[in-house]
């Protein structure tokens, strides 16, 4: 993970009344954008552990182990970005999870899927703004882990649903096709712009912690 490069920093408030923190531009902006989302995910899984759903899981159950592993991964991602960004890092964010029922399995897993799918789409959409190869490489490594999280959560919710049209441009072979690649769809994960991502993410952040990515374009 060594060798990451940072360029530019802007964590000043912008003129958008619904956002309090702008992530910045260039590589620093992308890394702060990722740092913010990882903070949100890590905070979510920490809260999950305090709810009746998690507390009711058998200690050796696969479901509990999956949640524990994901929580550890997200914490590691947060600390990684905090270290890499140093003084360029945005502040610690305050989440707002009032709309989530942490005692209810279905609600927890639905929101876990929201966060994981959002994280994958965010990395895929922001990658084009990364200007240096080392930063692009580490983003690729982290998004691959986030995609594994998303697939696991989807499969817990509904078996064999880890790939679906809402997150992947599914490839459908053409009727009667005999050659590979003859059909519709790319088979690639879908992406979202930073602005699209923050429309969702800001719903889970308190006033004073909401984000803008006006300089990631």
Show the residue positions of the predicted features:
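C-terminal motif of bacterial Sec signal peptides marking the signal peptidase cleavage site
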Residues: 4-8
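All-alpha RGS (Regulator of G-protein Signaling) helical domain and cognate RGS-like helical scaffolds
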Residues: 11-217
């Amino acid at each position: 993970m060594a060798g990451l490069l940072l360029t530019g920093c802007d964590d000043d408030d912008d003129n958008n009344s619904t956002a309090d923190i702008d992530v910045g531009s260039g590589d620093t902006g992308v890394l702060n954008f990722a740092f913010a989302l990882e903070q949100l995910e890590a905070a979510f899984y920490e809260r999950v552990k305090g709810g009746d759903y998690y507390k009711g899981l058998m200690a050796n159950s696969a479901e509990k182990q999956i949640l524990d592993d994901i929580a550890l991964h997200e914490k590691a991602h947060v600390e990684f970005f905090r270290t890499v960004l140093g003084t360029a890092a945005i502040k610690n964010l305050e989440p707002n999870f009032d709309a989530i029922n942490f005692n209810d399995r279905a609600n927890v897993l639905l929101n876990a899927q929201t966060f994981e799918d959002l994280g994958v789409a965010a990395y895929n959409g922001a990658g084009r703004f990364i200007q240096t190869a080392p930063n692009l490489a580490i983003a690729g490594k982290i998004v691959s882990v986030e995609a594994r999280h998303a697939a696991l959560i989807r499969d817990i919710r509904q078996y064999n649903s880890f790939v679906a049209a809402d997150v992947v441009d599914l490839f459908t072979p053409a009727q009667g096709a005999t050659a590979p690649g003859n059909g519709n769809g790319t088979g690639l994960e879908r992406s979202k712009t930073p602005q699209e991502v923050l429309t969702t993410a800001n719903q889970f952040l308190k006033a004073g912690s909401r984000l803008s990515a006006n300089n990631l374009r």
